[in-house]
């Protein structure tokens, strides 16, 4: 596993309701076979923590040593079955997801076919993809970044909430500028917040957003707060989406049976393709659409595209739109083509990503506590 890091210029000042984003951290899984063919995966959990990832990669590498790299589902069951006592829904699943993606990329490169063919072939000719950033507390930066996304071909943009009492003016500014041109997703980012808002805060925000045109409201509560999700649906007709930090179909089961989400979001670089398909199939049975969560590098982006093209109930996939140079080094073709909010099937072998070991020197990782989740409880939102 290689950890890459890029420090954002201070002028960007990326922040949201639960913390600040000072760095782009990319934990890359590189899987190599006996013939020196390689595949790439990514581990979303590695953005937040370093040491456990290293140990878990070593653990699963020993477990899979001398295994046939083409037996991908068997490898998943072997990893999960051997770790179930301590890894039912934890960080280990996230490491498994990164390995799973790397195995598919490796097989695609060896067979000289795109990953979507290994996943059963396309269900649709194109997939909607949205630009995901909006980590701003002022309309000027928000609108400039959204315009950057629009000029590339995006027609849906996601913004993060910083202050629930101030976000409506930003939403209003966006809708005025991009009316009939680009739609907006609002992410409350409470799913993994250290100090989440009171239930009333999220309900009041949803009521205010009713007057604005948005695609969906994402994670207005901590992911385990099923009652909050039930309550908010009594007060709003907005589409409510979640819960990206849940890694398995088994964990999503209660959310579907309790009907607390309108749109399911699983993280592609946590669940991987094997478990991601189970989540989508379960959602399909419950007539629920899926919006793939992909808050990572080009590896996660391409994984979301390949997967989304092959699954009937995937409505969106996500493109992490923070401004950094790492993606240019990982995209095989430097960028993906986006037109009128959609992207089509990639013309590539594997995922369409590449890796040079020298990237570790170009983007060196510095071990430290990540600031993406702040634990300060000095200002708890009550209304």
Feature roles, as predicted:
Residues 43, 131-134, 159-161, 186-190, ...:
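A cross-domain feature marking catalytic cores of carbohydrate-active enzymes
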